[in-house]
């Protein structure tokens, strides 16, 4: 089954590292863009991930878990069935 995930990462302030959040977000985007079978579009507010449902869930299980262990952060997700893109009419 095809699915679409909207994901946002909000790193919480790291002690004495005010600009660190930009590096954390850019690293996360770089890491998830390496996943095969997924198409990722990013903007200033969130990223949209298109792909097979099982691959998207695997991304959540692996990458999100790792970032939550490593950084104080909050993730916001929305997931829906199909390729939910206005450009795919």
Q: Where are the language model's segments positioned?
A:
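Charge-rich, low-complexity N-terminal segments
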Residues: 1-89
